[in-house]
């Protein structure tokens, strides 16, 4: 650490603890999913997000609530960091109608329009056309990139 970084930290202690808590929530969820999958309680494919928790939590800090998200097939962490309830995710993994996709999406196709989380895709790279189409549709419907200040790093500024 240099003198400047000690004088003006990127995040307050409270904010850093909040980020750590979010990362731990994701890890605990994934660890429990791994246990349930190993016990054959979760069927189908299960692509875990272990070791990538900081990515999801960090990315969500730079997004606004109105920003849309299209994820890859390892999307549990992004969904949790976005605010989708773990109970709905768990129900989805169990194939229950109370899941965010009514039990039909499973692990690789989490979707929640209210959270502007437009799901993942089982094909590696398959999310790119979906994201581009979504961005184009939003651009044609309303101007989303205005001169207003983006939320990037807002909580971290000193």
For each of these PLM feature ranges, what is it?
Residues 31-35, 39-151:
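Cofactor-binding active-site loop characterized by glycine-rich and histidine/acidic residues
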Residues 153-158:
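Positively charged, low-complexity/disordered segments
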């Amino acid at each position: 650490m240099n003198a400047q970084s000690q004088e003006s930290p990127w995040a307050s202690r409270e904010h850093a603890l909040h980020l750590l808590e979010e990362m731990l929530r994701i890890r605990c969820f994934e660890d429990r999913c791994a246990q349930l999958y190993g016990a054959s309680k979760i069927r189908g494919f299960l692509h875990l997000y272990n070791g990538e928790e900081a990515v999801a939590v960090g990315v969500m800090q730079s997004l606004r609530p109105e920003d849309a998200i299209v994820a890859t097939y390892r999307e549990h962490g992004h969904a949790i960091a976005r605010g989708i309830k773990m109970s709905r995710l768990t129900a989805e993994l169990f194939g229950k109608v109370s899941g965010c996709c009514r039990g039909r999406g499973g692990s690789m196709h989490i979707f929640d329009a209210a959270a502007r989380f437009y799901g993942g895709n089982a094909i590696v790279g398959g999310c790119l056309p979906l994201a581009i189409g979504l961005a184009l549709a939003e651009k044609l419907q309303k101007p989303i990139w205005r001169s207003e200040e983006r939320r990037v790093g807002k909580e971290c500024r000193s």
